[in-house]
Regions:
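Conserved catalytic cores of soluble enzyme domains
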Residues: 158-288, 292, 296
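Short active-site-adjacent helix-start/loop capping segments
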Residues: 70-72, 120-122, 164-166
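Short hinge/gating elements
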Residues: 51, 61-64, 125-129, 270-273
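Glycine-rich beta-alpha loop segments
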Residues: 82, 92-94, 100, 105-157, ...
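Terminal peptide-recognition signature
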Residues: 15, 56, 112, 159, ...
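Short coil/turn segments at secondary-structure boundaries
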Residues: 67, 71, 128-131, 169, ...
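Intrinsically disordered, low-complexity segments enriched in small/flexible residues
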Residues: 1-109, 277-319
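Short, motif-level signal for alpha-helix interfacial/capping segments enriched in acidic residues
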Residues: 33-36, 136-137, 230
Length: 319
Protein backbone atom coordinates (compact mmCIF):
# COMPACT_ATOMS: atom_id res chain seq x y z
CA UNK A 1 0.00 0.00 0.00
CA UNK A 2 1.31 3.44 -0.93
CA UNK A 3 2.01 5.56 2.12
CA UNK A 4 0.61 9.05 2.54
CA UNK A 5 3.33 11.62 3.23
CA UNK A 6 2.76 15.10 4.60
CA UNK A 7 4.53 17.99 2.91
CA UNK A 8 7.17 18.33 5.62
CA UNK A 9 7.85 14.59 5.35
CA UNK A 10 9.01 14.84 1.71
CA UNK A 11 12.74 14.47 2.53
CA UNK A 12 11.88 11.31 4.48
CA UNK A 13 9.77 10.06 1.58
CA UNK A 14 12.67 10.60 -0.82
CA UNK A 15 15.01 8.53 1.34
CA UNK A 16 12.47 5.74 1.76
CA UNK A 17 11.90 5.66 -2.00
CA UNK A 18 15.65 5.31 -2.47
CA UNK A 19 15.71 2.44 0.04
CA UNK A 20 12.94 0.65 -1.85
CA UNK A 21 14.76 1.16 -5.14
CA UNK A 22 18.05 -0.24 -3.82
CA UNK A 23 16.27 -3.11 -2.06
CA UNK A 24 14.60 -4.14 -5.31
CA UNK A 25 17.92 -3.94 -7.13
CA UNK A 26 19.67 -6.01 -4.46
CA UNK A 27 16.96 -8.68 -4.43
CA UNK A 28 17.11 -9.00 -8.20
CA UNK A 29 20.71 -10.13 -7.85
CA UNK A 30 22.22 -7.07 -9.43
CA UNK A 31 24.54 -6.27 -6.52
CA UNK A 32 25.03 -6.63 -2.78
CA UNK A 33 23.91 -3.30 -1.39
CA UNK A 34 23.52 -4.19 2.30
CA UNK A 35 26.05 -1.59 3.47
CA UNK A 36 24.43 1.18 1.44
CA UNK A 37 20.95 0.15 2.61
CA UNK A 38 21.97 0.14 6.27
CA UNK A 39 23.45 3.61 5.90
CA UNK A 40 20.30 4.90 4.21
CA UNK A 41 18.06 3.40 6.89
CA UNK A 42 20.11 5.05 9.60
CA UNK A 43 19.94 8.40 7.79
CA UNK A 44 16.18 8.02 7.42
CA UNK A 45 15.69 7.23 11.10
CA UNK A 46 17.83 10.18 12.19
CA UNK A 47 15.97 12.52 9.82
CA UNK A 48 12.60 11.22 11.01
CA UNK A 49 13.48 11.82 14.67
CA UNK A 50 14.89 15.28 13.95
CA UNK A 51 11.84 16.26 11.90
CA UNK A 52 9.33 15.14 14.51
CA UNK A 53 11.25 16.70 17.38
CA UNK A 54 10.70 20.19 15.98
CA UNK A 55 7.15 20.15 14.64
CA UNK A 56 5.26 23.44 14.93
CA UNK A 57 1.59 23.51 16.04
CA UNK A 58 0.26 23.49 12.48
CA UNK A 59 2.41 20.52 11.53
CA UNK A 60 1.18 18.71 14.63
CA UNK A 61 -2.37 19.46 13.49
CA UNK A 62 -1.62 17.79 10.17
CA UNK A 63 -0.13 14.77 11.96
CA UNK A 64 -3.18 14.53 14.23
CA UNK A 65 -5.34 14.34 11.09
CA UNK A 66 -3.08 11.88 9.25
CA UNK A 67 -5.29 9.33 7.44
CA UNK A 68 -3.03 6.42 8.42
CA UNK A 69 -3.10 7.23 12.13
CA UNK A 70 -4.63 4.37 14.17
CA UNK A 71 -8.34 4.87 14.81
CA UNK A 72 -10.79 3.56 17.39
CA UNK A 73 -11.37 0.28 15.57
CA UNK A 74 -7.61 -0.33 15.59
CA UNK A 75 -7.35 0.30 19.33
CA UNK A 76 -10.31 -1.97 20.00
CA UNK A 77 -8.81 -4.69 17.82
CA UNK A 78 -5.42 -4.41 19.53
CA UNK A 79 -6.48 -3.86 23.14
CA UNK A 80 -9.99 -5.18 23.75
CA UNK A 81 -10.78 -8.90 23.86
CA UNK A 82 -14.26 -10.34 23.34
CA UNK A 83 -15.58 -6.98 22.18
CA UNK A 84 -19.35 -6.83 21.74
CA UNK A 85 -20.58 -3.71 19.96
CA UNK A 86 -23.81 -2.16 21.20
CA UNK A 87 -25.79 0.01 18.82
CA UNK A 88 -28.58 2.56 18.94
CA UNK A 89 -29.75 5.20 21.39
CA UNK A 90 -33.22 3.61 21.90
CA UNK A 91 -34.76 6.91 20.79
CA UNK A 92 -33.97 7.53 17.12
CA UNK A 93 -31.35 5.23 15.65
CA UNK A 94 -27.70 4.30 15.53
CA UNK A 95 -24.85 6.66 14.74
CA UNK A 96 -21.67 4.94 13.59
CA UNK A 97 -19.58 8.09 14.15
CA UNK A 98 -19.43 6.80 17.74
CA UNK A 99 -18.71 3.12 18.21
CA UNK A 100 -18.94 1.46 21.61
CA UNK A 101 -19.61 -1.68 23.54
CA UNK A 102 -18.38 -4.16 26.13
CA UNK A 103 -15.13 -6.08 26.26
CA UNK A 104 -12.15 -7.13 28.32
CA UNK A 105 -9.05 -4.98 28.63
CA UNK A 106 -6.14 -7.06 29.90
CA UNK A 107 -8.42 -9.27 31.92
CA UNK A 108 -10.73 -6.53 33.22
CA UNK A 109 -14.26 -6.02 31.93
CA UNK A 110 -14.73 -2.49 30.58
CA UNK A 111 -17.07 -0.33 28.55
CA UNK A 112 -15.25 1.24 25.62
CA UNK A 113 -16.44 3.91 23.20
CA UNK A 114 -15.10 6.59 20.93
CA UNK A 115 -15.18 8.43 17.64
CA UNK A 116 -14.41 6.48 14.48
CA UNK A 117 -13.41 8.40 11.34
CA UNK A 118 -12.91 5.49 8.96
CA UNK A 119 -9.86 4.47 6.91
CA UNK A 120 -11.16 4.71 3.33
CA UNK A 121 -13.95 6.38 1.37
CA UNK A 122 -16.59 3.77 2.20
CA UNK A 123 -15.88 3.66 5.94
CA UNK A 124 -15.47 7.43 6.19
CA UNK A 125 -18.95 7.86 4.78
CA UNK A 126 -20.28 5.11 7.06
CA UNK A 127 -18.80 6.80 10.13
CA UNK A 128 -19.50 10.35 8.90
CA UNK A 129 -15.80 11.23 9.27
CA UNK A 130 -16.12 10.89 13.05
CA UNK A 131 -18.61 13.76 13.36
CA UNK A 132 -21.33 12.46 15.65
CA UNK A 133 -25.04 13.26 15.56
CA UNK A 134 -27.29 13.48 18.66
CA UNK A 135 -28.07 9.77 18.53
CA UNK A 136 -24.34 9.07 18.81
CA UNK A 137 -24.03 11.02 22.04
CA UNK A 138 -27.23 9.50 23.39
CA UNK A 139 -25.78 6.07 22.62
CA UNK A 140 -22.72 7.12 24.62
CA UNK A 141 -24.95 8.05 27.56
CA UNK A 142 -26.66 4.68 27.32
CA UNK A 143 -23.28 2.93 27.45
CA UNK A 144 -22.14 5.05 30.40
CA UNK A 145 -25.30 4.16 32.31
CA UNK A 146 -24.67 0.49 31.61
CA UNK A 147 -21.10 0.83 32.87
CA UNK A 148 -22.33 2.40 36.09
CA UNK A 149 -25.01 -0.26 36.57
CA UNK A 150 -22.45 -3.07 36.35
CA UNK A 151 -19.54 -1.25 37.99
CA UNK A 152 -17.32 -1.26 34.90
CA UNK A 153 -14.59 1.28 34.10
CA UNK A 154 -15.11 3.42 31.00
CA UNK A 155 -12.43 3.94 28.36
CA UNK A 156 -13.13 6.59 25.74
CA UNK A 157 -11.13 7.46 22.62
CA UNK A 158 -11.54 10.98 21.25
CA UNK A 159 -10.85 11.74 17.59
CA UNK A 160 -13.22 14.18 15.94
CA UNK A 161 -13.16 17.53 14.19
CA UNK A 162 -16.38 18.27 16.09
CA UNK A 163 -20.01 17.25 16.33
CA UNK A 164 -21.94 17.12 13.05
CA UNK A 165 -23.48 20.58 12.34
CA UNK A 166 -26.22 19.46 9.94
CA UNK A 167 -29.84 20.65 10.06
CA UNK A 168 -31.17 17.24 11.07
CA UNK A 169 -28.71 17.02 13.95
CA UNK A 170 -29.78 20.43 15.21
CA UNK A 171 -33.45 19.51 14.89
CA UNK A 172 -32.86 16.40 17.01
CA UNK A 173 -31.16 18.38 19.78
CA UNK A 174 -27.42 18.28 19.13
CA UNK A 175 -26.48 20.74 21.88
CA UNK A 176 -28.69 19.00 24.44
CA UNK A 177 -27.25 15.59 23.56
CA UNK A 178 -23.68 16.86 23.95
CA UNK A 179 -24.56 18.47 27.28
CA UNK A 180 -26.21 15.28 28.58
CA UNK A 181 -23.22 13.18 27.59
CA UNK A 182 -20.85 15.59 29.33
CA UNK A 183 -23.06 15.66 32.43
CA UNK A 184 -23.24 11.88 32.57
CA UNK A 185 -19.48 11.59 32.27
CA UNK A 186 -18.98 13.98 35.17
CA UNK A 187 -21.32 12.10 37.50
CA UNK A 188 -20.40 8.46 36.78
CA UNK A 189 -19.49 6.46 39.89
CA UNK A 190 -16.92 4.35 38.03
CA UNK A 191 -13.42 5.19 36.72
CA UNK A 192 -13.39 7.09 33.42
CA UNK A 193 -10.27 7.54 31.28
CA UNK A 194 -10.36 9.54 28.05
CA UNK A 195 -7.61 9.53 25.44
CA UNK A 196 -7.32 12.09 22.65
CA UNK A 197 -5.85 9.98 19.86
CA UNK A 198 -6.06 12.48 16.99
CA UNK A 199 -8.21 15.61 16.89
CA UNK A 200 -10.12 16.74 19.95
CA UNK A 201 -12.55 19.22 18.44
CA UNK A 202 -14.89 21.38 20.54
CA UNK A 203 -17.95 20.09 22.43
CA UNK A 204 -18.06 17.03 20.23
CA UNK A 205 -14.83 15.94 21.89
CA UNK A 206 -15.63 17.10 25.42
CA UNK A 207 -18.80 14.98 25.42
CA UNK A 208 -16.57 11.88 25.61
CA UNK A 209 -13.79 13.46 27.67
CA UNK A 210 -15.46 14.29 31.00
CA UNK A 211 -13.09 11.88 32.70
CA UNK A 212 -10.98 11.32 35.81
CA UNK A 213 -7.90 11.26 33.62
CA UNK A 214 -7.53 12.83 30.18
CA UNK A 215 -4.59 11.49 28.20
CA UNK A 216 -3.34 12.78 24.88
CA UNK A 217 -1.04 11.26 22.30
CA UNK A 218 2.15 13.23 21.71
CA UNK A 219 1.12 14.66 18.34
CA UNK A 220 -2.62 15.03 18.96
CA UNK A 221 -4.46 18.34 19.37
CA UNK A 222 -7.36 19.45 21.58
CA UNK A 223 -9.16 22.75 21.06
CA UNK A 224 -12.44 24.63 21.17
CA UNK A 225 -12.31 25.26 17.42
CA UNK A 226 -10.16 24.20 14.48
CA UNK A 227 -7.27 26.46 13.40
CA UNK A 228 -9.12 27.08 10.12
CA UNK A 229 -12.26 28.12 12.01
CA UNK A 230 -10.33 30.38 14.35
CA UNK A 231 -8.55 32.04 11.42
CA UNK A 232 -11.88 32.66 9.70
CA UNK A 233 -13.26 34.36 12.82
CA UNK A 234 -10.17 36.34 13.82
CA UNK A 235 -8.92 37.44 10.42
CA UNK A 236 -11.76 36.49 8.05
CA UNK A 237 -9.21 34.34 6.25
CA UNK A 238 -9.22 30.57 6.69
CA UNK A 239 -5.90 30.31 4.85
CA UNK A 240 -4.20 31.74 7.95
CA UNK A 241 -4.80 28.49 9.84
CA UNK A 242 -1.09 28.14 10.58
CA UNK A 243 -1.05 31.54 12.29
CA UNK A 244 -4.08 30.55 14.34
CA UNK A 245 -2.55 27.22 15.35
CA UNK A 246 0.56 29.03 16.58
CA UNK A 247 -1.60 31.14 18.92
CA UNK A 248 -4.19 28.64 20.13
CA UNK A 249 -2.11 26.45 22.51
CA UNK A 250 -3.58 23.26 21.07
CA UNK A 251 -0.57 20.94 21.32
CA UNK A 252 -0.01 18.33 24.01
CA UNK A 253 2.75 20.20 25.94
CA UNK A 254 0.68 23.39 26.13
CA UNK A 255 -2.42 21.47 27.20
CA UNK A 256 -0.48 19.65 29.92
CA UNK A 257 0.96 22.92 31.20
CA UNK A 258 -2.54 24.39 31.50
CA UNK A 259 -3.96 21.32 33.23
CA UNK A 260 -6.38 20.53 30.42
CA UNK A 261 -4.82 17.09 29.96
CA UNK A 262 -3.13 14.95 32.60
CA UNK A 263 -0.59 12.91 30.68
CA UNK A 264 1.14 12.82 27.30
CA UNK A 265 1.53 9.39 25.72
CA UNK A 266 4.71 9.15 23.65
CA UNK A 267 4.32 8.24 19.99
CA UNK A 268 6.78 6.22 17.89
CA UNK A 269 9.41 8.20 16.00
CA UNK A 270 7.57 9.54 12.98
CA UNK A 271 4.16 9.62 14.66
CA UNK A 272 1.56 7.00 15.52
CA UNK A 273 0.93 6.32 11.82
CA UNK A 274 4.54 5.21 11.33
CA UNK A 275 4.10 2.19 13.64
CA UNK A 276 0.47 1.65 14.72
CA UNK A 277 1.23 -1.62 16.54
CA UNK A 278 3.80 0.05 18.81
CA UNK A 279 1.43 2.97 19.41
CA UNK A 280 -1.43 0.67 20.41
CA UNK A 281 0.79 -1.36 22.75
CA UNK A 282 2.23 1.80 24.33
CA UNK A 283 -1.20 3.26 24.98
CA UNK A 284 -2.40 -0.06 26.38
CA UNK A 285 0.42 -0.08 28.92
CA UNK A 286 -0.40 3.47 30.00
CA UNK A 287 -4.13 2.75 30.31
CA UNK A 288 -3.42 -0.33 32.41
CA UNK A 289 -1.35 1.71 34.88
CA UNK A 290 -3.93 4.49 35.00
CA UNK A 291 -6.74 2.03 35.76
CA UNK A 292 -4.68 0.37 38.48
CA UNK A 293 -4.04 3.76 40.12
CA UNK A 294 -7.79 4.45 40.28
CA UNK A 295 -8.77 1.03 41.57
CA UNK A 296 -8.31 2.20 45.17
CA UNK A 297 -10.79 5.10 44.89
CA UNK A 298 -14.37 4.76 46.10
CA UNK A 299 -17.28 5.84 43.88
CA UNK A 300 -17.65 9.07 45.88
CA UNK A 301 -13.93 9.78 45.55
CA UNK A 302 -14.06 9.18 41.80
CA UNK A 303 -16.88 11.69 41.34
CA UNK A 304 -15.20 14.26 43.58
CA UNK A 305 -11.80 13.87 41.92
CA UNK A 306 -13.34 14.23 38.47
CA UNK A 307 -15.26 17.36 39.42
CA UNK A 308 -12.21 18.92 41.07
CA UNK A 309 -10.14 18.19 38.01
CA UNK A 310 -12.39 20.38 35.88
CA UNK A 311 -12.78 23.05 38.57
CA UNK A 312 -8.99 23.43 38.54
CA UNK A 313 -8.73 24.13 34.80
CA UNK A 314 -7.67 27.74 34.32
CA UNK A 315 -5.93 27.98 37.68
CA UNK A 316 -2.47 27.06 36.44
CA UNK A 317 -0.28 27.51 33.42
CA UNK A 318 -1.67 30.94 32.59
CA UNK A 319 0.93 33.11 34.29
Amino acid sequence: MMRHYLEFERPIADLEAKIEELSALSQSGGANLDVELDALRQRTEVLRRETYSRLDPWQKTLVARHPERPHLVDYISGLIEDFVELRGDRKFGDDQAIVGGLGRFRGQSVVVMGHEKGHDTATRLKHNFGMARPEGYRKAVRLMEMAEQFGLPVLTFVDTAGAYPGIGAEERGQAEAIARSTEKGLTLRVPVIATVTGEGGSGGAIALAAANRVLILEHSIYSVISPEGAASILWHDGSRAKDAADQMKITAPDLLKMGIVDRIVEEPAGGAHSDPEVMIETLGNVLEKELQAMSFLSPDQLVEQRAQRFYDIGRKGLS
